[in-house]
């Protein structure tokens, strides 16, 4: 948001308030049996409501209203959280709410990723000299996101319907083509940039796997985990590491420690997808995925925790 508005990032007490509300939401859900599901839902949903308010305020104050559309997707994520709580209480499970939440988060990855990936890639490649550069956000990207959102809406409501399957496969092909336009093959020299392309690769992979559910024996969980662990999980760590290097005054370069973090989270994503595709190996693969996932995020904590708590390097 600060990059869009030219304003300082949220800091101090407002940032502490957001963190406190997020932690309160986690505690409220954990103790929902004691405080009641309505109270738990209200506390849990307060975080995303405050995020919407903070983002909207910054965008309007920065007079960058064209980016207000980001609030649509954050608002959808908030609505998905409400659906999750209501469905869990009245139906005993939250199947639709979970899919809705994944779909809304994936839409954010597609929207924001479609801007930052070609942007960071172009900055990196321009320093390397002549060669193909990524195509920046244009009408095709808007068409791709709109088509993907339509397919995701169908997936939330009827994930095994054959027409939905065709829409999902078509969205997967669109996103493969979208990714190919960003010159990712030229980023192998810098893992900090390459990981963004690898993270986005899980977006079309998840669409195709989810689309094949209606036509093959591929389980629904394969595509779900391609999105949740792959696209969302890997992209989260990719952005966290890049932002943390910048916030702590370090060079924007992925050293061996950061590369190990990337390797671990990619292994977690691959193992979790294959655990769904090869159930005879699921016991081993699930443990590999869990261990690699924990290792990746603990590795991030070890690599950046101390630096983020200290004053920024000059």
Please place each PLM-identified region on the residue numbering:
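Hydrophobic alpha-helical transmembrane segments of multi-pass integral membrane proteins
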Residues: 1-314
